[in-house]
């Protein structure tokens, strides 16, 4: 939370060993840079101005002599964000994120991810039969199905800021940015969340309960919720998750 903005920022899982910060993974570093920017950003920014300025912030984190990020999207700092501008009464959805406004769900899914997740769900039972050590006690020890789809996940990143929007230090694909304009003359109950919640609900309690039910019934994410990764051994959920709920007065 900042004076003028409320946001949930989700750094993308690194798909490369290359790091741009000595102590932080790329996704966390991107999240930190965006968060710091929002704390001092002018209240009056439009979504276009925000996208331009936050892109500059990330781009400046790349070494001047490093051309890899331009050539290879998997080498980039990358994050998704759902941002509420308190002055403009708008919600900006950039990348894979979700929100609820007065009980109505809005999503901004990556277009290429659903078919890749579907492929993983088809492969998982076969590979589990081939590798008995793949799972233990309802947790994935090694996800051979994810290994199989990883080349497609990396290839899909070629669409980054070409066919879908993310914050990665290069011009944001504005047709992929979703803007929700809130009515100025009435209050709103708002939930902003990362994609770590498979089923977003109007409250944290209900969202957590839905997550627990998914973990109990489909921990590998191959049936009721198909995803590109499941519950790994040693983890308590499928992915990092963040949620903030607030009431915006008129």
Identify the role of each PLM range:
Residues 1-250:
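PP2C/PPM-type serine/threonine phosphatase catalytic domain
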